[in-house]
């Protein structure tokens, strides 16, 4: 699979481990930064990753910040991105199978590296089920994006 991986400063070490695992398993994995522990802003890396997924440079993404929450909020602002923060394997599989999630968010300060690598492996290995009920629900979410995704007037 072709993946993009990005993090803020809190996730640099975990990002390196994730990239190493993905490459060793035969995936293509682009490192979208950061590569420093100097403080940076996670929305900048969420944007780079979201644009890579939306632009077709990656099929899916893995985005890492301290908690996983901020990165997830930022990524979900991009129309067509379905990001989920997962810190267990069941959620990582289920979010793809049922919700066709295309960005996995991890909290480097929440999850240990070994569990994180299992979560990433399960996320990458999962496929959208395509079940009618899930397609119907995703169509409703997509309609929300179309109706409510426009900027609010001042």
Q: Where are each of the predicted segments found?
A:
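Short amphipathic alpha-helical segments
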Residues: 16-19, 73-77, 117
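Short, structured coil segments at secondary-structure junctions
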Residues: 25, 78-79, 99
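Helix-adjacent hinge/juxtasegments
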Residues: 48-86
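Structural motif
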Residues: 38-47
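A short beta-strand-loop structural module common to alpha/beta enzyme folds
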Residues: 28-39
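Glycine-rich phosphate/diphosphate-binding loop of Rossmann-like nucleotide-binding domains
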Residues: 1-25, 29
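C-terminal binding/interaction regions
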Residues: 2-6, 10-13, 89-154
């Amino acid at each position: 699979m072709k993946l993009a991986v990005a993090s803020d400063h809190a996730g640099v070490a975990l990002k390196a481990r994730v990239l190493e695992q993905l490459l060793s398993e035969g995936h293509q994995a682009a490192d979208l930064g950061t590569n420093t522990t100097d403080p940076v802003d996670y929305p900048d890396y969420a944007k780079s990753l979201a644009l890579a997924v939306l632009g077709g440079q990656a099929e899916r993404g893995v985005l890492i910040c301290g908690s996983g929450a901020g990165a997830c909020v930022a990524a979900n602002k991009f129309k067509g991105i379905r990001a989920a923060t997962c810190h267990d394997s069941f959620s990582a599989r289920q979010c793809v199978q049922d919700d066709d999630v295309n960005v996995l968010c991890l909290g480097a300060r929440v999850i240990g590296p070994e569990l994180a690598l299992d979560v990433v492996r399960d996320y990458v290995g999962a496929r959208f089920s395509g079940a009618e009920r899930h397609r119907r629900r995703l169509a409703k979410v997509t309609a929300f994006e179309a109706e409510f995704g426009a900027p609010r007037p001042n």
